[in-house]
Amino acid sequence: HGLGLLVLMDVVHSHAADNARDGLGEVRFGWDGPGCGYFPPGPAGHHPQWGSRVFDYGAWEVRRFLLSNLRWWLEEFRFDGFRFDGVTSMLYHHHGAGRGFSGNYAEYFSDETNEEAVTYLMLANKLLHELVPSAVSVAEDVSGMPALGRPVEEGGLGFDYRLGMAVPDKWIELLKDRPDEDWGMEELMLTLCNRRYTERTVAYCESHDQSIVGDQTIAFRLMGPAMYDGMSALEGASVEVERGLALHKCIRLLTMCLGGEAYLTFMGNEFGHPEWVDFPREGNGWSHDKCRRMWSLADTPHLRYKFLLAFEEAMHALDDLYAFLPSPHQLVSAVDEEAKLLVVERGPLVLVFNFHTTEDAEGLRVGCGLPGKYRVALDTDAFDFGGKGRVSHDAEHFTEPGGFNERPCSMQVYVPARCAVAFAREDD
């Protein structure tokens, strides 16, 4: 708090250990019948996919227990809010297992909906925001439950944000299965924009799910073993490293500007940490070798990791200056599959992404909402970010009337291949 940081706790109220010896499995409240323990009797009290127990959210003592748990963390440790784990599992009796959600309301409101769990989550968010009005609650939900992120007073579940979990899955799918020349621009745009209007989403490229043992970080998928012997800034970059650095920056900026109303960075992603996380366990001989983050990589002057960190800092500085993340104005004015271009308006900014592997976009006409003079506010190709410095920050881009791509004004810009540029309008 002294550093100006909010601290959220990952709270797990979606299930509990299947442990009768030192857990809650056999605890009774002093009477027999419904609501006499923490878990429903029979199959309803068990989570078959996770091998754990499911709380009886309709029981008064269970609600008292879980709500008092939230209050204890808030008051005793001064947490600023919670990221609720496994919300999809709570919302439905089928726990979301093997289900695909298309957006049909019948998938969300049926006999499969766990109304008692829904009620508990509403109570939890109401309590949280009454105790600490500035508190933040985030839901880990993959189903897209309507009104999850609307206030309880409106009939919603009261969460401030939901996690945009489809976005990292899409990036990993593209990186694993397709070369970047085959990436679909409309496919990317639809994935990033596929969220409920007026419900805020946390966008992110990767999290612990993509960085644990058995998986790979985005940086490693882009650059592979070159991350170990090709990251020296004292010599020219290889083709693999040059491509990896360029796409790593574009992926983060596109996710931040188009994927939601908040942005999450997993520890180390901001500078392209190469290795996964693996905690000591029997399967690895209780090794601490990968139980770490090598923060020194970003602090070493002769390594290229510093460029990725500098770009992360610049992205957040851009949001501090132009407040584009909380802005309701988000518009994609151009999607060009052949040229691999996306033109995005977010807040007051116009951002152009060129994912083409070889072709620079020179003299590219892009639409914009307001007339005037625009300058470069951020570009991924700057020397400070390990780029080639091909985009001039001194150039003035004047708009022309007449309309373009259903926007009232347009201007001409230059965006190199595998680069992204953000343009900001200068006040008169």
Q: What residue ranges belong to the model's regions?
A:
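Aromatic- and glycine-enriched glycan-recognition loops and surfaces
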Residues: 1-6, 60-65, 115-122, 242-249, ...
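Substrate-binding/active-site clefts of carbohydrate-active enzymes
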Residues: 1-113, 396, 413
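Generic structural signal for well-ordered alpha-helices
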Residues: 9, 70, 74, 121-125, ...
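Conserved alpha/beta catalytic core and glycan-binding cleft of carbohydrate-active enzymes
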Residues: 78-80, 95-284, 288-291, 320, ...
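Catalytic cores of secreted or luminal carbohydrate-active enzymes
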Residues: 294, 300-322
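Trp/Gly-enriched beta-strand surface patches
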Residues: 371-404
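C-terminal beta-strand-rich structural cap/linker in extracellular carbohydrate-active enzymes
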Residues: 391-428
